Amino acid sequence: MAKPIPRIGSRRNGRRIPKGVIHVQASFNNTIVTVTDVRGRVVSWSSAGTCGFRGTRRGTPFAAQTAAGNAIRTVVDQGMQRAEVMIKGPGLGRDAALRAIRRSGILLSFVRDVTPMPHNGCRPPKKRRV
């Protein structure tokens, strides 16, 4: 079983974190933004659902932009200047979250797409007929 990654205190503590990793998971239904330090310990996180969006509005680009802004605001206050971005998933919020991260003033060392792609693995679900 995977060990849980320990969390670094509360969101408001005064730890200085100069460099970190921003993980963006964009599904069709929601966008989750997690900011970790370089060792993988969670510093801050936010999602479209925690920002007050409900139902189908959680999957929108504006909701992803708001979630990314909320997650990054706390780490900018803790002194983060440089970050790497890992984007996962096919959702609409991918570009909007990246735009919000770029606008925050953090220098991005690289942006990597880590969406899992099957090499002809499991059979996909049947196509929807509406």
Curated annotation (Swiss-Prot):
Superkingdom of this protein's organism: Eukaryota
Main localization (coarse): plastid
A cellular component annotation (GO) from this entry: ribonucleoprotein complex
GO molecular function per UniProt: rRNA binding; structural constituent of ribosome
Record GO biological process: translation
Entry keyword set: Chloroplast, Plastid, Ribonucleoprotein, Ribosomal protein, RNA-binding, rRNA-binding
Subcellular location as annotated: Plastid, Chloroplast
Subunit and partners: Part of the 30S ribosomal subunit.
Family: Belongs to the universal ribosomal protein uS11 family.
Protein name per the record: Small ribosomal subunit protein uS11c
Source species of the chain: Drimys granadensis
Lineage, highest ranks first: Eukaryota, Viridiplantae, Streptophyta, Embryophyta, Tracheophyta
Recorded name of the encoding gene: rps11
